[in-house]
């Protein structure tokens, strides 16, 4: 009877331990930013954003150059103009400076909107693919191991290769 009780306790421990092991969650990791940056769509979007940025920079540079030329002209002509004309010209210069500042601010907002518009679907595609691969491989949790996002140690399964394969990159 004592052996039976010992055997029963041993069986209970083995079954309990095995169910505990099976109950543990499977965890994987992936550097999501690295994945997104490897996607061709990301590179194309960044290129388009950079092109738009250069266009805005060139326009602003031309506006500033035009303002500088106008200011030089007004300064050269100032001695031969009345105080009233010089004051009017000074207001014109200030209005142009404000206009350039407003244009610069609008250009920055435009760039930010364009970046969100272009990158949001790329990040969503990566997220969907990560979920698909994780689910197919039976992972309940996927941690983002991108530097600075809080994962200290990432020795579990790295899904990068599988997700890249799923995305065709």
Label the model's feature ranges.
Residues 1-8:
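Bacterial N-terminal signal peptides that target proteins for export
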Residues 9, 13-15:
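Hydrophobic alpha-helical targeting segments used for export or membrane insertion
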Residues 18-23:
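Sec/Tat signal peptide C-region and signal peptidase I cleavage site
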Residues 24-169:
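Amphipathic, charged alpha-helical segments and their helix-to-coil junctions
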């Amino acid at each position: 009877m004592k052996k039976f009780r010992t055997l029963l306790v041993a069986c209970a421990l083995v079954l309990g331990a095995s169910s505990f092991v099976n109950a543990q969650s499977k965890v994987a990791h992936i550097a999501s930013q690295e994945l997104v940056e490897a996607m061709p769509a990301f590179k194309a979007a960044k290129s388009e954003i950079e092109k738009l940025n250069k266009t805005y920079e060139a326009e602003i540079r031309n506006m500033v150059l035009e303002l500088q030329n106008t200011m030089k002209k007004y300064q050269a002509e100032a001695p031969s103009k009345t105080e009233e004309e010089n004051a009017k010209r000074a207001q014109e210069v200030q209005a142009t400076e404000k206009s350039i500042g407003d244009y610069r601010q609008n250009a920055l907002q435009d760039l930010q909107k364009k970046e969100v518009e272009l990158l949001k679907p790329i990040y969503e595609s990566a997220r969907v693919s990560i979920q698909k691969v994780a689910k197919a491989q039976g992972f309940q949790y996927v941690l983002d191991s991108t530097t600075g996002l809080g994962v200290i140690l990432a020795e579990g399964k790295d899904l990068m290769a599988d997700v890249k394969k799923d995305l065709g990159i």
